[in-house]
Curated annotation (Swiss-Prot):
One of its GO terms (cellular component) is TAT protein transport complex. Its main location: membrane. Part of the twin-arginine translocation (Tat) system that transports large folded proteins containing a characteristic twin-arginine motif in their signal peptide across membranes. TatA could form the protein-conducting channel of the Tat system. This is Sec-independent protein translocase protein TatA. The Tat system comprises two distinct complexes: a TatABC complex, containing multiple copies of TatA, TatB and TatC subunits, and a separate TatA complex, containing only TatA subunits. Substrates initially bind to the TatABC complex, which probably triggers association of the separate TatA complex to form the active translocon.
Length: 53
C-alpha cells in the first residue's frame, strides 16, 4: 500500500497550510541541509568502522 498521487497532494496541501507560503522555502532548505548532514554522517560512520577492524 503505497502513497498515491492524491495522498501526496493532500500531504503537501496540509504542509502548505501549516507553514504558509512565506515560511515554506526556509523549511525546505532546513530539511535539505538536515538530510545532507545525515547522509554525510552515515558515510563517515561507515569509514570509521573499517578503520577500527
Amino acid at each position: 500500500m503505497g502513497m498515491s498521487f492524491s495522498h501526496l497532494l493532500i500531504v503537501l496541501l496540509i504542509i502548505f497550510v501549516l507553514f504558509g507560503a512565506g515560511k515554506l522555502p526556509q523549511v525546505m532548505s532546513d530539511l535539505a541541509k538536515g538530510l545532507k548532514a545525515f547522509k554525510e554522517g552515515m558515510k563517515d560512520d561507515g569509514n570509521d568502522n573499517d578503520k577500527n577492524e
